[in-house]
From Swiss-Prot:
GO terms for molecular function: toxin activity. Residues 143-152 have a biased composition (Basic and acidic residues). Expressed by the venom duct. Residues 22-48, 63-82, 98-160, 177-207 form a propeptide. GO terms for cellular component: extracellular region; extracellular space. This is ConoCAP. Residues 1-21 form the signal peptide. The modification Glycine amide is found at residues 60, 173. It comes from Conus villepinii (Villepin's cone). The modification Asparagine amide is found at residue 94. Disulfide bonds join 53-59, 87-92, 165-171. Changing residue 87 to A: Complete loss of activity of conoCAP-a. The gene is conoCAP.
Length: 207
């Protein structure tokens, strides 16, 4: 006994086949899935704007969900397409499809002022890189000199590490002393017993 579904399928099959043949996305996908010899014959100027593009099924537009229908509904199965390396608002392009026919957005000449700005920026970056290299060489030389001075016991002195370095003139590779503006005065106070007693009395300390 023939079911009602089989009867409807036989009746609607001639109607669904022309609709499937007229689907622009299926035509696009069939062109992409062709071999390279047949694909090269496809005209680039007939490519319409693609709304969605990913790395698995190429570009698909508003009929992307319908083009995934099964073969029994009159739609062929979508083959696994190769990844498209470049995609913009004009569609996906690869080595088989030239960029010359992509439209005015890709064929617009480059503004000469942008080239000048790019050259100026490149020169500035090169100058900054060379200045940074020279500064690094100077720092290495200063570190080597400080290493030689620190090996001399007479030159080691009372050097101590700074507690705080910032960008306002903190550590600059010279003699790094702890509170260097006050170090000499503190040494004078430490040598003078009467001044030390007065300072301890003033601060409330007991010697």
């Amino acid at each position: 006994m023939v079911s009602l579904g089989h009867v409807l399928f036989v009746i609607l099959l001639p109607v669904l086949l022309p609709v499937a043949a007229d689907d622009p996305d299926d035509q696009m996908l069939s062109q992409i899935s062709l071999p390279s010899s047949s694909r090269s014959e496809y005209d680039d100027n007939d490519v319409s704007k693609r709304v969605f593009c990913n790395g698995f099924t190429g570009c698909g537009g508003r009929h992307r969900d319908r083009s995934r229908r099964q073969e029994r509904y009159g739609k062929r199965l979508i083959p696994v397409l190769a990844k498209r390396p470049f995609c913009n608002s004009f569609g996906c392009y690869n080595g088989k499809r030239s960029l010359s026919g992509a439209g005015p957005a890709l064929s617009t000449p480059v503004d000469p002022s942008r080239n000048n700005k790019a050259r100026t920026m490149a020169r500035m970056l090169d100058a900054a890189a060379s200045a940074r290299h020279e500064q690094q060489q100077q720092l290495l030389q200063q570190r080597e000199q400080r290493g030689l001075e620190s090996r001399d016991p007479a030159a080691s002195g009372d050097l101590s590490k700074r507690l705080f370095c910032n960008g306002y003139g903190g550590c600059r590779g010279g003699k790094r002393t702890l509170y260097s503006p006050w170090l000499e005065r503190m040494n004078e106070v430490a040598d003078d017993r009467s001044a030390r007693n007065a300072l301890c009395t003033r601060l409330g300390w007991r010697e």
